[in-house]
Amino acid sequence: MEKYEKIAQELGVSLKQIDTVLTLTAEGSTIPFIARYRKDATGNLDEVAIKAIIDMDKSLTALADRKETVLAKIEELGKLTPALKEAIEQAEKLADVEELYLPYKEKRRTKATIAREAGLFPLARMILQDQKDLERAAEEFLSEAFPTVKDAISGAIDILVEAIAEDPQLRNLTYQEIRKHSLITSSLKDESKDEKQVFQIYYDFSEKIANMQGYRTLALNRGEKLGVLKVGFEHPVDRLIRHFEARFKSKNGYIEEVISQALKKKMLPAMERRIRTELTEVAEDGAIQLFSENLRHLLLIAPLKGRVVLGFDPAFRTGAKLAVVDQTGKMLTTQVIYPVAPAKAAQIEAAKEELKRLIRQYSVEIIAIGNGTASRESEAFVAEVLKEVPNVSYVIVNESGASVYSASELARHEFPELTVEKRSAISIARRLQDPLAELVKIDPKSIGVGQYQHDVSQKKLSESLDFVVDTVVNQVGVNINTASPALLSHVAGLNKTISENIVKYREEEGVITSRAQIKKVPRLGSKAF
């Protein structure tokens, strides 16, 4: 119940709503189904609220499971104090749990491990206790592994460095100070790898971590990955050292070395990794949310129903690919013309005549021009032709993903006899007629909805974009007699196999006119119905 209360407080929903959503999900109901058909039970929660409840439940469950594991492991070691147990139980992030667990994790053999095994722990304690004449005291701890006083003191320092670097309170202090006061920086590493100088503004860049914007984080990550940039940090090291020294009474000089090593060799690198991870997670979440919103708007563009459309896939050298589709999206014909340079004048003139012939023969009402290579030149060509053809207009269509679709198994199945370029022209025409029906055939990541879509977690991006597609399809609805398997598969309760069976049933039995007929589709049981 504590988990439910956290979800309720965070999301502003009731305990009953949370219980209903999670119960329905456990029973196999999908988010679109719950949002559309269980409004009474959920109190009219929409898809976004339902998904937020499910996601937060997963996150809190993972956190609780990890706490349970960590507590059990520390208890096995006999080192679980009431204070430590409470700290772990109160931790709100996985990263905080890992910080508390760090001193108790099984480690590979370190210099500190070897020093402890050689019995140097008491000498380390003497450093902390400001032992007078430490060098003479160290003579009592010499061994084969640490044969000199210098070696023994160095070993004792290693023990303290590891202990301080793993102290949860000091690590939290360091983390908070870095979050507030440190800068993230970047400098030029190899200009030859940035021919177009895409990353020029990051050649000499610095920004407070607290003010870092998501798109800058993703840009630094990409520049670093490509070998163009070197990313680093500037820390208030002196300020941190003063904080640390205030925690220790020892003034023998060795403690300064301990603190310096603990910070520079252990804590700062660890905190930098943590903060880079956190900045990236925040940036990814923001980018994915933006990509999802862009995709949603794209899918919800109003369809242009009942019009004969000519799809125009522009190109320079290889010629423009044309495809005419009827009012239902059925392909009528395809053609290749050479309307722009480097085509010769005679080829361009022939292209004009061919375009006019197609418009007249198939009663084309609107031309959809792809916005890719040679789009401007093609637009000028089409505009010139349409001066001689009344009542026909053109529109520029976002062709992102059309080439991906044209080379896909689905496109090969739809148009096995056509080249990929002609399939692409058909896709451009159809996405003007019905953007949703056509775009669902394409992997959402290929539709071109965001600048950094290849720099974020592909798993999280796919899940988010797939959720948007499912939500929009179920919001808009589909025509069971015309929808493709790709579109049907996003309907709540249906999958790829059932969707293909629906289309096959249509082809064999004709138009579906009643709900009773739907139940006759193979594999479409009462639960899916």
What is the predicted role of each segment?
Residues 1-19, 26:
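Generic start-of-chain signal for non-secretory N-termini
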Residues 3, 36, 62-79, 89, ...:
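Long, highly charged, low-complexity intrinsically disordered interaction regions
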Residues 24, 37, 73, 163, ...:
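Generic, well-ordered alpha-helical scaffold segments in large soluble proteins
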Residues 26-28, 116, 233-235, 314-316, ...:
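Flexible glycine-/small-residue-rich
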Residues 29-47:
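Feature marking long nucleic-acid-engaging regions of large polymerase/nuclease enzymes
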Residues 49-52, 59, 63-311, 315-417, ...:
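Duplex nucleic acid-engaging cores and interfaces of nucleic-acid transaction enzymes
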Residues 308-325, 351, 355, 484, ...:
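Extended, hydrophobic alpha-helical segments in both membrane/secreted and soluble proteins
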